[in-house]
Curated annotation (Swiss-Prot):
Mapped zinc finger ranges (C2H2-type): 640-665
Origin organism lineage: Eukaryota, Metazoa, Ecdysozoa, Arthropoda, Hexapoda
SUPFAM superfamilies per record: DNA-binding domain (SSF54171), FYVE/PHD zinc finger (SSF57903), Glucocorticoid receptor-like (DNA-binding domain) (SSF57716), Tudor/PWWP/MBT (SSF63748)
Example of a GO biological process term: chromatin organization
Originating organism: Drosophila melanogaster (Fruit fly)
Basic and acidic residues compositional bias, start-end: 140-160
Gene symbol of the encoding locus: MBD-R2
Protein name: Protein MBD-R2
Quaternary data: Component of the non-specific lethal (NLS) histone acetyltransferase complex at least composed of mof, nls1, dgt1/NSL2, Rcd1/NSL3, Rcd5/MCRS2, MBD-R2 and wds.
Amino acid sequence: MGRRCCVANCPSTSRLLEHNGVTYHSFPLDPIIRAIWIKNSRISLERQITKSVLVCSRHFRRLDFNTIRNGKYLLKPRVFPTVFPWGKMDTAEIEADQRALQHASVEGTTETPGNAQSSTNDDVIKATVDQIVAQILSESAERKATEEGKTGKAADDVKNTPESGEDANKAAAKEPSGTPVAASSEATVPAPGSASSSNSPLPGTPPKYSNPHNLTIGARLEALSVEGNWLPARIVEVNETEQTLLVRFERNHKLKVSPSTSGSFQEWMAIKSERLRQRLSNRVLPVFELDEKCMARWSGPRKFPGTIRKLLGNDTYEVLFDDGYVKNVRAVHMNKMPKQLPPVQVAEEGASKSPTPVGTPVSSAPVAPKRASTGSLGGSSGSSGSKKSKCAPQRRDWPLLDMASLDIASLGLPEIPHDGEWTCHWVNDQPIGTEGFLIVGEHQKPTVIVQDWRLPPGWIKHMYQRSNVLGKWDVILVSPSGKRFRSKSDLKLFLESQNLVYNPDVYDFSIHRRRAKDINAYVYTHGYNPQPPPKPRPMDVSMNSTLDQSITSQHSLPSTPMPVKESQYMEAPVASLMPPAELMSPQTQPADETKPKIEAEILEASEGGTSQLMLADPHVVENGFAFIGGLKVKIQDNLYVCPREDCAKTYRKEDFLLIHIRHYHKEFAEHVSHCPKMQELAVKRTHPSSIDQVEAVPKNQIPNQQFFAKMHQQDLQQSRSFKRQSVSATATSSTPSDITPTKALLSPKMEPPSVSPTVESGIKQEDVSLDAGPTQSFNPSLSRSCKRARLSPSKRPSGSRKSNRQRSQRRPILSDNPAGHGLTEQDVEETRQSFNTPTPDTRIDSKKRRSGAATTPISSIDSPAMGDSVSTPSSNDQTDINAALAPPPAETLSKAPQYIKENGELIRIVRMRQEEIINCICEYGEEDGLMIQCELCLCWQHGACNGIVKEADVPDKYVCYICRNPQRGRDSMRFKHDQDWLFEGKLPVAAYHTANPQATKQFELLKRSHTLTGNLLDAKRSMHSLLVKINIARNRCHPKLYLWAKKWDEDNLDSTALTPVKRAKLEAPDLPNVPQPEAAIDPEECQYRLIEHIKVQQSLVLDRLNDIEAEMDELEKEDTLDDLKDADISTTKEALATFIKELETMKRLAKLNQVANMKQTLRDSATSK
């Protein structure tokens, strides 16, 4: 029996071929949507609605369907028919039904706690259906009354009908929402196996889960596995006739077994099955219209402005972002455009603090913005003396959110599921929880206590933000006894001592940001601008580093004393328009000229009150502005706006803005220290090679006790920073104008954190003592050693090797600097220990050929004690650390060539270049003795390892063992490298044979014969191409005849005969450059040109064959061998046959020997195991 549409006057039926392709849909189970279907279809209320009562697809709009992969259409949930034979429903009536349906669904989820179980509660369904049926009866009566009246008031009645229908729908939507409340209050407690009872233990809380209500393909839900675990899943296919769903379990790396017994991750389940549930969301999704402005999410939690282009349905929109990119975004990831602030607030802000205009460079001493802190500021500007008083309020390192003033409900954060991966809510890059603290040293460290249901009772999870790394959050677990843990290793040892098992899923030290972003639990408020991570500062390598540091410290030092809370933890200011220190070289700007300016600037900074110079982080956000270099850039909707007034272009990243300024606004480029290039950005995106990578240090390398001690030391170091700045400022003010004091003992490549406070204070005192002395003249060798980079042995990158060309001996100081003797041995020893100076290698190789050997002059060859005396310095000598690591001067190396004496003969030492590689079979990467180079891989190897001891034994062409026996090489390419007999005509000759004077002539004849053979092969290929062209010329309709639309030979002759002539460039007329149409191609002319071309090529091939024949005749005349045509060569044939037989025998023996060796190797490996 076929299916038929139940709508009156609809001819759709599945029994006729003309209705093929029409789909039929049964009435939905939801009573509210079913009532709308009955009302719109005008079905009699007395008719019983069963599964056989169907509505065809002709009564739905195209917008009501979803397109699935196989091209079929699937009806969306919660839609109703609107197209009928008596006409299409009015748009206002359709919108009224949608609003009533949405209002009823929202009220049902928020006000009725038992609405999730409405499908199983017959009383609730019956009451709801009775109310809707009553509304439909009253509406049908009004419709009949309007149809009977055929007077002139018919037009007014038609207008009033939609209004009455809308009021009826609203009433029908409001009444059922109140009816289930009363019914559910009288209902009994649901079964313990239901989803709502398992996740909502309190009777007053609304249910978190319900039966699947979103049946679209790809919708998320949770399914109960065979083991009894609720696992996340997605809908793959929907079968409306059988009311079943094909569910695919999402793969989880924590699953040890398959979620189903059959071993597959897909399973058919009934829609009403108790093994399926979906989370109820109380969040009302915003509704957008066409061409409406909105804030849509990009790849992360940040949202950017865009415009709605299309309404795709299923709460999905096509958004055109302001930068021109188009993307489909769901409504959960979109917000309405925020309202602009009233002009009164802007006026008040301008009165309180007038910001600098956009695009203007920052002045040399702007006011530093301070972080807002929730703690109370204690003390006044003169209360610096009460720094260590116990009555002072506890400071807070970071501006944590005020939990009391934060409205969590308005943010629309979802509830964290208690199954699967753990996470917590994040607002403005901060976890949401209970405010807490940890006592570290003498103060309290503010933390956030987050709830983790996996931890055993009594355990507490603290999350805190580091004070030295912006935005970095760490986790500390506190046991019931009060013991703190920050690493897995310490916690594992503790649990093992307590006879407990360590479970990494329970004791988790990860913060799980990605999980929070996936479930939309990571949000930003409207007035918050996320601060990008700070970039590393460029290292100062100039000679005036100490002077620059003292100047910057003096600028950053306030003239009036500040409270402890502000002075210790204030934001680093932004750099001014002064060029960076690495660009100020002594050649372009002498120290004598810059000193008065510097002193004047220091005086201005000291007289300026609290004005401070901004130096460090270029991303200080203040009232919607960011300082990039020396420019103040506006931030609008998380985008950087170009500082040019008439430009107003926006960019997502700072680098793109700098590139735009460098290319289009060169007047602003001078205010930025560094404008990146596209090549530099491409290099940053590439993955570093294994040579550039340094071995990674484990994250949890610091023990638990040392970590908290280190945190305390950092806080103490920050509190003492102003003392060191004042000392350095005093030292700078007392320095004469003609002295540029440098950190002579510091390497410019070393990072400041590696210096301990005691050593740094010692270095500061040494600088002061050096400044007190008379004018000093720098030694050129000393300045050169100061600029040379060093690498610690433990920090040497992979791929580098330490050879003698990188070694040098420690030499005494040759400088006549009187101030240099002020250093004591204790200071030198402390500096050596603080910088982990590598010990110079004292081994000197005695035999080298092509390598970097020890620099021993010829006059001291016979003195073996010379190397020891040079390589081992006396402990009483005054040595310089940098001079000991620097290489010997270039003058001493280039005075005379270096030699060694071997068996009474002098051998000259050739130094290897830095880029040359040593790759020997002994796997020793140092030069030792005679070195030979492979012709193929160009790697150097030890001659002794390859059986070559003397230089006379080195072959003319040497191929190493690795190139001769490559791994997994083809047999046909095994002797690819040995082709001298083909190209040079040289045949292998045994060493025990006597020299043949005719060998050179024979090799020449063989080479010429091989050349002729190659020419014959080239002529054969040319003849093949001529045959192909002849085949093309025979066929007039051949598709490749167009290639000869022009003559080939004439073009070649003209191009070779013409010589380039330099002519004056003519000015092009102001005529439009319009492309001219090409002339039509005549196949007959192409055929004629091809035949002419074949004739020319044929003549060239014949001439080439004639030349080859002439050369062959000449070679035959030069051949001095006897003609063997008539000679008796039977003896020679027998000898060759015997020789070939013996070769076959040797080949078999070699094969047997190889098999025996393989068996022996396998046997040895088995015994060793």
